[in-house]
Amino acid sequence: GTSDKRANKLMHSLYAPLLSKGAKYVNSSRRGAELIKYASNAFLATKITFINELANLSEKIGVNIEDISIGMGLDKRIGGRFLRAGPAYGGSCFPKDTRAIVDTAKEFKTDLSIIKNVIKSNENRSKILLNRVSKLLKNKIKNKRITFLGVTFKANTDDMRESSSLVMIPSLISKGAKIKYYDPSGYKKDFDKFKNVSFSENIKSACIDADMIIIHTEWNDFKALNFKKLSSKKNVIVYDMRNILSPDKMKKDKINYFGIGR
């Protein structure tokens, strides 16, 4: 965004290489540019939250949320991106920008009720997934060995900002669970202060004695694992919070498998 013609001309010069390749340029004010950024991220956060809420409904009525996502995504007005059910959104942008746009609206005495409810629903997301963990373990979490595969807020990063693992792992510890985790990024800082949490150097050591394996982050490393050989526990539960595994293959391999919205 710019505030005068000279600044606008400089911006055009700066982005000339991209504009020559077909990129679009919006001649906006500085405040307009700020609102574009906030609104874009708030809208994407809304899509994630929307599909997560539909996943809750899908589990209740016995349909597959993946079918819903694909079907919706075929509509070009909607598109399939950011329609993957999973944990709460995190990272450096969506949580910050949704709160910022709500605060801006409040400053100007305007109510953004949709975005406020998106924030509220996202904050409640980890609680819903933790309730499912408890139910899968028959409400007996104490002394259960639970492995998290991935702790970052998304794959291919070491960014832990607002990751839902920062909510779920401490909650499970408080209920007496023993946690191991492995993340391909090698991240191992945030959980050092907790007892009964340990970082594993590889997938095998993380899962060897697990009662439950939670796929928290959609790293490619986790998409082709042989769960029969990973844990010494015969009835290990695999809770796929990213739906990156095939339910049919898990059933064929006789794995005690559960996904999101399935």
Name each region found by the language model.
Residues G1-R262:
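Structural/interface elements that position substrates and couple domains in central-metabolism enzymes
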